[in-house]
């Protein structure tokens, strides 16, 4: 918020804070405009990728939307935090966020009164996994016409075979970290029955 106040002439921190947190405004058109501007700068170039990752923000208390005791990758442990899934368009050393989705744990979506107290819109009071949020980011980028050659994810997403298969089904090229104990085939395996050794079947 402070950086915005520094960049916007004749702005006031408290007024901006009130506008962003208490005024009724749609954030999606603003986020989509950022995606369009990023695409105009680096979209469509050879090597441009859409990176998907999550990040956690440590919190005290229980009032912030989506706050819960959950995995905080920044700290490497379970902690009271909010978690967001982010999409960034990047090529070499040029990268910028183009989308963000707040993860709502089931303890939030199973408690409509808590959601209402925190002003969570009814349309957002649905539990979606982080993998589903990642898919929403990818689909939204394609819907907006953002031009990228591939999707990049870390092991938290790359270890989900279902997620990778959904990317393949959508025709997406992807680069994914996987866990070290994941078995993979470098070529399509052919069905094989070992020969009988003459013993009992």
Where are these regions (language model features)?
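Alpha-helix initiation and N-capping motif
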Residues: 1, 13, 27-35, 160
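Gly/serine-rich nucleotide phosphate-binding loop at the start of the catalytic core
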Residues: 1-23
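A residue-level signal for conserved active-site and pocket-lining positions in enzyme catalytic cores
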Residues: 4, 87, 174
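Hydrophobic/basic alpha-helical segments enriched in Actinobacteria
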Residues: 5, 9, 67-70, 171, ...
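Alpha-helix C-cap/termination motif
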Residues: 7, 41-44, 144, 169-170
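Electropositive, glycine- and tryptophan-enriched low-complexity nucleic-acid-binding patches
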Residues: 14-19, 74-148
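Active-site-proximal, Lys/Arg-enriched surface segment
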Residues: 21-106
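An internal, acidic/charged active-site-proximal segment
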Residues: 112-201
